[in-house]
Amino acid sequence: MEPGSKLSEDETFSQTFNEEEQEDSRNKDILAFDPSVDNEPLLTKKLSSLSIYSEPSPDEASNLQELKFVSSPPSVRVPRSRRNRRNSRVDSEARKRQFDRVKHSVSNSCKLHLSLQGQEAAQLRSDSLYLEASDKRDLTSLVTRVKELARKLSAARLAFRFRKVLLICNDNKESIERSVELAQWLLDTFSFTPSSSHNNMASSNTQSNTQLSEMESEEKSFNKDVYPNDEYTPFTPKNQFVIYLEDTLASLDVVESLSPKKNVRFWTSELCTQCPNLFDCVITVGDDSAALRASWLFQDVVPPVLSFSTAKAGFLSILPIAEYTKTLDLIFHRGFTVNLRMRFQCSIMRYVGEHSTHICEGQYSVLNELLIDRGPNPFMISLDLYVENEYITTLQSDGVCVSTPTGSTAYSVAAGGSLCHPGIPAILISAICPHSLSFRPIILPDSMTLRIVVPLDARSNAWCAFDGHHRIELGLGDYISISASSFPFPSVIRSKYSKDWFDILRQTLNWNDRKGRQRSSRYKSHVHKTNTSEEQN
């Protein structure tokens, strides 16, 4: 096709775009988002991927008078031979044309059905970050100060009142008994009295009583809806804990022996979803699966999570349960340090072939990994990878594992992925048994948006799982959008150092286990004392 003819087709597509928008606005049933829901925050966040250029008027430069969407004309699908269809991954232009028919610009809206108003575009402009520096030296100094601020925030010690504690344990006898023992200790022997260094901080919080009353009224209304026959006992703001245990444990004898009973309540998944701000902290007892369950229960806001291990320490459950009295006493009185672990926000987009658009079926937050595999199919699957709407490659394998830094020591390392410290915000992509020997795991920054598409000419469907939960089938044309979640997982750690992660790496995975060349414990303790004395000086 000549360049002149292609330009005319683009102009024709731009002219007919507004007419298609007007027709689609009258058909509310085919829109890719709910008009009754306020989509402005979502549009403001996701519209940066659109190809838009504006022509502001001389009078109002902040408002856009005309918007033009630049897009390639819809391509016509040409029949291809069976060999070319199976080896279409080498034709990047064909993949780009195919993605033009199935890609979207906003997670809850399709490009052909998006009506962008001047106010929303102006809001998008105002959210941009502008930095001014007189020279390169000032810019370097600014970057250094930002890194120093991030380092201090990661090492900051927090201290606030804990009153309502949610307990999560594994479904085994030892974990349940340990959880009940910990709950009884909190109810009987522990009384929260903040130290003098934290009295000023606690007294300066004038909104604490208001927030308590709001959360109590929220919980009261929820309990009346879910448990209409139960008598609601209001919470009195004293130095006593209110313990929430799982409702499935209510009939056990060890749970019925807890006292006082007015401070023992039971939680459900609905309560965690609808009232996430009700709980001050979450305590998990068991292994790493208990901490993953806490992340799955709180899809948005997550309270600080303390993870105790009943057996061998894991990468999430690093606190030994045998020392829970000492650990909790230090945390509640002297404060604690939180490691904000990155989570993914995964959006499932269903392809509507009748209207050549997509609809968002659901969103899930994952702490470990998103797994896409071939499921029960006996042959490998084809997946198209796009980063920021740019075609990267077509992967032919048994599946792909998209992991967070926290999940780099789980399924990802078994798939050949790299180990990544949880303090590094990154997206790890590892193929599962790839057909091409040249495919290597890749690490992307968390600022990018990854899209994994099941091609329209794929041989079979794919299956996906989110942290081992909620297994879903992906049809032809469907895809998943992966981006960094706005709600990280706050994991309570004992110190600001990364000593725990490296110790567990050596203990659990036997990382670089060559005993003849490892330093002795005496040498390591001497180095630790030297570093501590240097910091104190």
Curated annotation (Swiss-Prot):
Bias-annotated ranges (Basic and acidic residues): 88-98
Transmembrane segments: none
Protein's name according to its UniProt entry: Uncharacterized kinase C1B1.02c
Source organism (scientific name): Schizosaccharomyces pombe (strain 972 / ATCC 24843)
Keyword Nucleotide-binding tagged: no
UniProt keyword list: Kinase, NAD, NADP, Phosphoprotein, Transferase
HAMAP family from the UniProt entry: NAD_kinase
Modified residues (Phosphoserine): 72
Pfam families in the record: NAD_kinase, NAD_kinase_C
Listed InterPro entries: ATP-NAD_kinase_N, ATP-NAD_kinase_PpnK-typ_C, NAD/diacylglycerol_kinase_sf, NADK
